[in-house]
Amino acid sequence: MKITIYFFLLLLSFTINSVSATVQKFNFFDLNKQLNIFLKKEYPLNEDSIKIIIHTPLKKNIYCRKPDFSILSNTHNLGLINILLTCSKQHYYLTVEVQSEGEYIVANRKIPRGTRIKESDLKILIGRLDVLPNNTYRKKKDVVNRISLREFFPLQPITSFMTRPFWLVKVNQQVTVIINGNNFKMSSKAKSLSNGAQNQNIRVKTNSGKIINGIINENGEVIVSP
């Protein structure tokens, strides 16, 4: 009888240990899985390939039924980021590396400062996005017709800090203002108070001294709607 009880207790202990190990392994695996899901929502890079590397080892005995993640930064840059993991009342600080590969825009040739950029000036490369400068352009259409603020060298990644819009309207320029009202349309001349690109809002001063706001159309006219 004692032998039977001994073997029963031994078997029960083995079963409990096995279940405990399985639960720990599952929870650790689930935590990594949940972190990947969270980061891929935070970095919606569409077709880009994303790889996540956790530099802070997670303890395998962490049990977290509903993990809550938050990025400890206002910017969503790629590369190394710090994440706060909250499990019930416990807090864990993680260092995570977000690597991504996708298309980005570089100069196809040497582009002088002040150039209105054409599509032929640009080239698409595929590579690591997390090692590029912040705000590197990803689409040609976002760069075409913009003005280079500095000289670009061949294969140099182009960022939003290196270009400005092409001004259809310049400060102090006489422009045509078109006012669209209910069942009427009228036009007059006014002086622009700033530079402006297509579809941008701009303030102009009429000949009577009144300051109004409007949207610049493709012809450089300022459209005022009620």
Curated annotation (Swiss-Prot):
The keyword Iron-sulfur does not apply. Its main location: periplasm. GO terms for biological process: bacterial-type flagellum assembly. GO terms for cellular component: periplasmic space. Pfam families: ChapFlgA (PF13144). SMART domains: SAF (SM00858). Keywords: Bacterial flagellum biogenesis, Periplasm, Signal. Coiled coil: none annotated. It is found in: Periplasm. The keyword Signal applies. Transmembrane segments: none annotated. Residues 1-21 form the signal peptide. Involved in the assembly process of the P-ring formation. It may associate with FlgF on the rod constituting a structure essential for the P-ring assembly or may act as a modulator protein for the P-ring assembly. Belongs to the FlgA family. This is Flagella basal body P-ring formation protein FlgA. It comes from Buchnera aphidicola subsp. Acyrthosiphon pisum (strain APS) (Acyrthosiphon pisum symbiotic bacterium). The gene is flgA.
